[in-house]
Amino acid sequence: MKHYSIQPANLEFNAEGTPVSRDFDDVYFSNDNGLEETRYVFLGGNHLEARFPEHPHPLFVVAESGFGTGLNFLTLWQAFDQFREAHPQAQLQRLHFISFEKFPLTRADLALAHQHWPELAPWAEQLQAQWPLPLPGCHRLLLDEGRITLDLWFGDINELTSQLDDSLNQKVDAWFLDGFAPAKNPDMWTQNLFNAMARLARPGSTLATFTSAGFVRRGLQEAGFTMQKRKGFGRKREMLCGVMEQTLPLPCSTPWFNRTGSNKQEAAIIGGGIASALLSLALLRRGWQVTLYCADEAPALGASGNRQGALYPLLSKHDEALNRFFSNAFTFARRFYDLLPVKFDHDWCGVTQLGWDEKSQHKIAQMLSMDLPAELAVAVEANAVEQITGVATNCSGITYPQGGWLCPAELTRNVLKLAQQQGLQIHYQYQLQDLSRKDDGWLLNFAGDQQATHSVVVLANGHQISRFSQTSSLPVYSVAGQVSHIPTTPELAELKQVLCYDGYLTPQNTANQHHCIGASYHRGSEETAYSDEDQQQNRQRLIDCFPHAQWAKEVDVSGKEARCGVRCATRDHLPMVGNVPDYDATLVEYASLAEKKDEAVSAPVYDDLFMFAALGSRGLCSAPLCAEILAAQMSEEPIPMDASTLAALNPNRLWVRKLLKGKAVKAG
């Protein structure tokens, strides 16, 4: 069985208050002066104080083996802040730290360890506040208003480095080779790790490590680093430093899922919903010039315009990519929304998904068998449902304690206002008719004979994504649906959590004393007119799922208050994020892919044309992480996702999977 929970660190604190691993019988940092040792070994060993002012790029990337208590990261963050204060006009503006940890500390142990260094408290408190759940894979933390990016990879570093996407190759400017001593933890210090470090190292990259062990020096030399010894810290005689002085050949392991970015830093986004808004912020943070073209007279008039939407992950025992993506997307979304400096109605009240019939009960039982962290999802018996939700249902289920609801329309509008303050240009009532490649950019033709030219274009226009020649073959479909707005009653007012069944019901929004109930589902439809039949169906599904609940029968839809929208979806329930694939070229280039994988060229795509679509009914959960993934890809920065899960988001995936099996592919 695949487990989706990571074992926490098994540690104790010694007489000096230093954390000690029980499993490895080694300290996390020196009893004497761990802070000064970090500054000497890792910051000094990589010459960071001298390199920061001369760095020719806006981003500096550091990778580390063994996050532990985060001492190395916090010390580096402090030094980077001091550099930025002393050199405000320097080219280098942002720091990206990538670290691997097999046994992450609990938040409580982390906070206890941080008491050792009061001078690091301002940085440590931010880290503790965002400390992720013990889930495998990459957890991206945006710190210091996005100037600091921390990618925490939970799992075995030798396994994780083999699962990294090729976009991480040659991105690292400095390596901190840390961890428990080689004699205590020999499984980490392998040639496989040294080779991975070399693969990820940018030409000119450096490394430093506290050990001077001969097999470590020889292994790093074999991987491609030029190594030398340096005086060790304190009583340690020697340590090792290295430089990547060569450019290593880097074969692409899965060229059919290759992702390309752009160095142009200027883009147009087509859309006006949550995807467009969050991507705008992510690109602006990276220094892009961004222009948004919205077909409507105001933002959030499409699928992002609902009053209340539920936030919780989509899980399935039989789909590892879906589980990995949505569990990490959900936790990222919560961190992101909590730090977002804009106002929007929301309540992290929890979400309870109920087993209202045999099929749904079986599905929930399968989800609960996946060894999920209790902070993410936990079983709830029928007799406890009323206590935690406030209403009687006579059903058991699964509760997502960190879930809840938010107002997508208000979120989208206010995020766009924030983006405008940061430089976003917005044009409303610009309906894109077609686009074509022109010189080194894209010519956009809008209704009313309006034109514009941009270096890079992102299509984030929901169900209208496939209306252009470049996207007409995409395997996406429209889903029309109606959400009913119902007045509260004394019984409904007791509802404390979002209920999910064969539909969903939100607690009341105290701003309007209404609940949302929905949604109807019409695959292939783009109808947005009010439907009395849908209104009645939304009510009836609630009654059918909870036939003994009197409060359900009292739901009143007679006011005919509702909102109709159209979503864009895929049959595998995952978003499509990345380069727009060239359908015709894909069929030609990959006609013999099943027999000639070794000869495959890089995925045929349209240069400088990207897409952010098919968020389906889980856009509030997936959009923040997808925006971060796409902005990182476009900016040629490290992407916070393992290769196989990232491939499951590739817009060409459904075609390529068939071609890899030698099956025929049809458009749409």
Swiss-Prot record:
- GO CC annotations? cytoplasm
Tell me which EC number(s) this protein carries: 2.1.1.61, 1.5.-.-
The UniProt entry lists the main location of this chain as: cytoplasm
Catalysed reaction(s) here are: 5-aminomethyl-2-thiouridine(34) in tRNA + S-adenosyl-L-methionine = 5-methylaminomethyl-2-thiouridine(34) in tRNA + S-adenosyl-L-homocysteine + H(+)
Q: According to its UniProt record, where is this protein located?
A: Cytoplasm
Q: Which Gene3D superfamilies match?
A: D-Amino Acid Oxidase, subunit A, domain 2, FAD/NAD(P)-binding domain, Vaccinia Virus protein VP39
The cofactor required is:
FAD
Task: Give one GO biological process term.
Answer: tRNA wobble uridine modification
Molecular function in Gene Ontology: flavin adenine dinucleotide binding; oxidoreductase activity, acting on the CH-NH group of donors; tRNA (5-methylaminomethyl-2-thiouridylate)(34)-methyltransferase activity
Could you confirm whether the keyword Translocase appears in this record?
A: no
State the residue spans of region: FAD-dependent cmnm(5)s(2)U34 oxidoreductase: 270-668
Residues annotated as region tRNA (mnm(5)s(2)U34)-methyltransferase? Answer: 1-245
Which keywords belong to this entry? Cytoplasm, FAD, Flavoprotein, Methyltransferase, Multifunctional enzyme, Oxidoreductase, S-adenosyl-L-methionine, Transferase, tRNA processing
Entry-linked PANTHER family: SARCOSINE DEHYDROGENASE-RELATED, TRNA 5-METHYLAMINOMETHYL-2-THIOURIDINE BIOSYNTHESIS BIFUNCTIONAL PROTEIN MNMC
Concerning its family, UniProt says: In the N-terminal section; belongs to the methyltransferase superfamily. tRNA (mnm(5)s(2)U34)-methyltransferase family. In the C-terminal section; belongs to the DAO family.
Physiological role: Catalyzes the last two steps in the biosynthesis of 5-methylaminomethyl-2-thiouridine (mnm(5)s(2)U) at the wobble position (U34) in tRNA. Catalyzes the FAD-dependent demodification of cmnm(5)s(2)U34 to nm(5)s(2)U34, followed by the transfer of a methyl group from S-adenosyl-L-methionine to nm(5)s(2)U34, to form mnm(5)s(2)U34.
Identification of the protein by name: tRNA 5-methylaminomethyl-2-thiouridine biosynthesis bifunctional protein MnmC
